[in-house]
Amino acid sequence: MIDETVLFTTSIDLSNHPMINAKIKLKKQYYLVLKYFVKKQLDNKYTNSRLIQYKEKFFNRIEIMEEESQIKNIIKALINSRFKPWKKKYKYWIMCDVALILMNDELIDKTALEMKKYMSQRQQKQFDILLNALKDNNVDISSIIFAEELMTQYRENRRFKEIKMHKYIVTANMSAGKSTLINALVGKPLLKMSQEVCTSNLCYLYNKPYEDERVHLQNIDFTNNATEKDLRNISWKTKTSIASYFRGIDDIKSHICIIDTPGVNYVLNQKHGKISQEILQQEEYEKIIYILNANKLGTDEEINYLKWISENLSKEKVIFVLNKLDEFRIAYDDIFMSINNVKKDLIIMGFENPVICPISAYFALLIKMKANGYELTDDEIDEYLFYIKKFRKKEYDFSKYYQSVYLEDGDNEIVEMSKKCGLYGLEKMLLGGII
């Protein structure tokens, strides 16, 4: 059975593919053989989009003359060319590419069996080294080292699909900073941030095993190379799925799905709260990330929603993220006292030992964008510098509210500020899997 989530979350980086610098004629042959083996096993939107990715990388805008009638001869020429020994590498690369695109053991094995029909027994024996190496990282690949880069990509995708997926569902009242927090955790601006409600349906954000500079988007249509414009113009009339590599302060090896739900207090559309409640009761997840706006605590809608969660869901699954504490003024507001008061209120509502994580989601996002090489606007640069100055004051050091998060002398600016604004602790708790 085909697991479409695996296909949706696979990473493939073709920037160093060994065929990029080959002659056009040879690349055409290679592509046609790859296309033949892939489509014979699985012909759907995911495999077709991958073939387009290869085509664009190999040829840019050059059109390929289809030669399907000659495909058997082309396969034989590439896979079993006895008089051109330098071509022996191609069958290994093709097999790796097929494996990366299909990500299914049964289909990969079927492809391997067909490819072997074009090989001598000696070639088949050597080819088995690759097939075993794709399944076992301990296999010696010194004799096929030329395929190491593609094998490494497949192995990492295989590792990723075999580990448990951790699902976290995010809920909040409008203007709590939900999209900003999610973007900060993901490490890139995938979700639109606005004071007005954007999310009127569910959005599933999946991480990928490694960075391949591609964002997968399933909305009305599917693309494995979504642009910023595509992400801005998402239709919230249907469920949305996005897959991208999550850029953490440290490398993220966990398999994560973050479920974004509609804001629950949008008066112009009463169904938003109902959608959130239904998904909270029906979806499987490990933790609920409930975002509180530190500037709007104690509203009737907030209290009613928290009571509903306390009465209908597992209270042990809830993590409270207290956002926008950076907007407090030290001369008038006491952050420590505010956090304690929130804790007391939550205990009264039935949350016996609430986990409260203070954070500045917007500063966290600026930190991630700067760390990951995004070009900040002049205003964002000014804001970043302002936050640096603010969070160097001891009153705004949120690291003390997280277990096992300590400032160290060797911390660079990014790490220091991520600890102080709460990002580092929350990220370790969620994406590091230490809840």
Per-segment meaning from a language model:
Residues 67, 80-84, 103, 132, ...:
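Generic surface-pattern signal
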Residues 73-147:
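Charged, amphipathic alpha-helical linker segments immediately N-terminal to NTP-binding catalytic cores
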Residues 404-415:
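Short loop/turn motifs at secondary-structure boundaries
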